[in-house]
Every structure is written in C-alpha cells, then in structure tokens.
C-alpha cells in the first residue's frame, strides 16, 4: 500500500469522496486541502501528484457544480518562511508564491490559515502590512479559514487575551 497521491487507489478515493460531497451537499464553498503548502514542504516528491489531482478534480467539480467555489488553504506563516526549522529553508518574509500559483487558474478564491503566535512572541509584533501582500498579489476573493493567537503560555508559544484582540485587529486591517 503506497499512500501517496500517485497511487491510483488514493486518487480514485479522493475523487469519489469529493464528488459525493458535491452531489449530496451542494456546497457553495469546497476546500480540497488544508494548509497544503505544509504538505508540499514536507513531501516535495509527492507535491506534483497532489497538484495534478487537484486540477483533475477541480474540472470534475465544475462540470457538475459550476457555481461551487473550489480552493485549497495555505498556511500563511509557513508561506512567509517564518517557522523555525522550516524544511524549505527559505528567507523570512520571502513569500513562496510559487506554492500558491501552481494551483492557478483553478483557485476560485485564495484562502489562508494564520497562527502568528508561531512566529511572534506577541500579537503587537505583527507588522501592520503582514497580510497586505495577499491584497496586492491577486484580485480574487480572500478568506481566512482558520487562525488565532494563543491566550496563554504553551511550550515555546507566548500569548494572552490581549494578544487575541490584537490578532483580530491585525487580520481585519
């Protein structure tokens, strides 16, 4: 059993499950992967297999449900090379746009997750223009699928309730 996205059984299962969701639930929005860039960083040899599967499944979804908005999500701190020990070894704030753009033109909207407590000790350290590159890179709709700032110390992460407020202000600016 080879569990990567090159495996025809994995591809068929992914496709069939996705189309069943489309047929039974008629979703307005459908995310086909969460924080896919972290998978691509960790399993670079399998990334192209997932990308090709995404494009194949996207076409099948659109053939049956053209109004369904299809996307994958991207982990913003990872995309910005802000994780300590990131296997991609990139320069901080040098955004890995190529990981997003390989899904184009088949991203109906750009969707991120953002947990800046993994990169900043306090939400007050989040740069004022932290999310601005998204606005200047695409004219598609943007969404935040998940995110937050920790409310207490937890291992290497710092935070408090004010950090949660500051995070919400940063993401809405």
List PLM regions with ranges.
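Substrate-binding clefts and catalytic carboxylate motifs of secreted carbohydrate-active enzymes
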Residues: 151-173
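A structural motif corresponding to the C-terminal end of an alpha-helix
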Residues: 20-28, 56-70, 103-106, 134-140, ...
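Active-site-adjacent "subsite" loops/lids of carbohydrate-active enzymes
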Residues: 1-20
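Glycoside hydrolase catalytic-domain groove-lining segments
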Residues: 66-69, 94-156
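Aromatic-lined carbohydrate-recognition surfaces of secreted/lumenal glycan-active proteins
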Residues: 31-34, 53-93, 140-152
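Active-site groove signature of glycoside hydrolases
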Residues: 16-47, 71-73
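Surface-exposed cleft-lining segments at the edges of enzyme active sites
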Residues: 3-6, 36-47, 112-124, 155-159
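Alpha-helical scaffolding within the catalytic cores
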Residues: 14-21, 76-101, 124-133, 169-171
């Amino acid at each position: 059993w080879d569990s990567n996205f090159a495996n025809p059984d994995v591809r068929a299962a992914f496709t069939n499950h996705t189309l069943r969701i489309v047929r039974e639930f008629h979703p307005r929005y459908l995310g086909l992967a969460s924080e896919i860039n972290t998978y691509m960083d960790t399993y670079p040899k399998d990334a192209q297999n997932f990308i090709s599967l995404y494009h194949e499944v996207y076409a099948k979804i659109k053939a049956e449900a053209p109004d369904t908005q299809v996307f994958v999500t991207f982990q913003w701190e990872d995309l910005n090379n802000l994780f300590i020990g990131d296997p991609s070894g990139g320069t901080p704030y040098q955004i890995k746009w190529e990981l997003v753009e390989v899904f184009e033109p088949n991203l109906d909207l750009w969707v991120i997750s953002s947990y800046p407590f993994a990169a900043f000790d306090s939400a007050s350290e989040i740069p004022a223009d932290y999310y601005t590159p998204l606005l200047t890179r695409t004219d598609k709709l943007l969404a935040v699928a998940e995110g937050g700032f920790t409310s207490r110390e937890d291992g290497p992460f710092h935070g408090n309730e004010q950090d949660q407020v500051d995070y919400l202000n940063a993401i809405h600016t």
